[in-house]
Every structure is written in structure tokens, then in C-alpha cells.
Amino acid sequence: MLKVTTLHVGPFETNCYLLWDTETLHALIFDPGAEADFIQNAIQKRSLVPQAVLLTHAHVDHIGALPELLKLYPIPLWMHPAEHVVYDSPDNAVPPWLPAVPDLPPYVNELPTVPGFDFQLLPTPGHTPGGCCYYFPQRQTVFTGDTLFAGNVGRTDLPGGDEQTLLKSINDRLMLLPEETIVYAGHGPATTIGREKRTNPYI
């Protein structure tokens, strides 16, 4: 059985997620935006064994804990290849007055596979060029980062953003998922695909 733990981190209250197997205690980490010590404590409290870090995108509020966290856990880090330009650039500092994250760890080019964690990668550019979502059919769960929120969608006024591309990504990818799918967004509360179809003014 897979379980989700939500951790609110950093000044932007980014949602960092731990998706973990209750039998093996293996875990995936999504978007560790800040507070590596806090994330580590949550991992240790549950005796989890991290297997990989997966990014929905590479803005600073989603990657801030990476340097310290990957020293603690030398595991693969992956993001969509189209997001490398954001990760490798000072433009990952959002808003612009924030400093870029120093000493970012290297990423792997091949999407990690972890037994017991079967998911579909959904490329959803628009908020950033390589934004993506991770859909876990067996748990009816999708991690959307800053592509889709409860009652809102991601901003597109930052470098690499494009409103029409974002809306197309949401409609062509996310809105085709089952309505009962739980949406775990990059900020704010969880929602469902069905609820967003009915109530989100941007869809």
C-alpha cells in the first residue's frame, strides 16, 4: 500500500511529498523545496528508505533542500529533460530577488524505476518548459507541482512560461484522468480531478 505524507516547507509553503510503501518503507521524494532537516526528520520518524527524488519543475521553491538532502541520501534526482535549462540557470530563482540555490547536485538522465511504484509520466509544460506530473494509477493519485492547484492553475508570467501551453497541458493530460484521482499540488490543499472539472474557473 502506498501512502502520501505532505510536508509544508519554506516561505512559500511548498508542498514536499513523501510517497511511501507501508510494507517495504521505500519512499519517493517530490519537490524538496526547503528545510532539509525537517524533511529528514519526517523520513526518520517513519523509518523510510528514500529511493529517488522526482521534481515536477525546477523553480527555487521546489529545489531548495536538494544540496543538503542529497548529501544525506545519495539517491537519483530526476526531472524532465526540458527542465534542465531551468535547473542549470540562475533563472530558477523565483521571484528574481531570491538567490539561486548554490551547489545543486547532479541529476540523472534516465527516469528511475522503483519496484512497487508504478507511475505514468505526464509532460505538462506551460508553467515551465519541462514541467511534468506523476500519475500513480493504483493509488488514483497525481502529483501536479505548479501546473494545477485547487481552484487555480500555475502562473505563466515567469521565464519559460506560456498560458496557452499550460491550459493545453491541463486539458489534454490531467483532465483525461479519472475524476476520482486525487490531485496533490505544489501549494495549497489536495483536490480531485472531478472537483477541478466542475469548479476551477480556469478550466
Listing of model-derived features with the role each one plays in the protein:
Residues 1-46, 133-145:
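Conserved beta-strand hairpin/beta-sheet module of binuclear metal-dependent hydrolase folds
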Residues 34-117, 202:
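Active-site HxH/HxHxD metal-binding segment of metal-dependent hydrolases
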Residues 24, 34, 60, 83, ...:
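Short, glycine/acidic-enriched loop or turn micro-motifs at the edges of active sites
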Residues 19, 56, 124:
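Conserved S/T- and glycine-rich ATP-binding loop of Class I adenylate-forming
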Residues 9-12, 113, 125-128:
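A short catalytic or substrate-binding loop motif that flags glycine-/basic-rich loops and adjacent residues
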Residues 89-97, 118-202:
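Metallo-beta-lactamase
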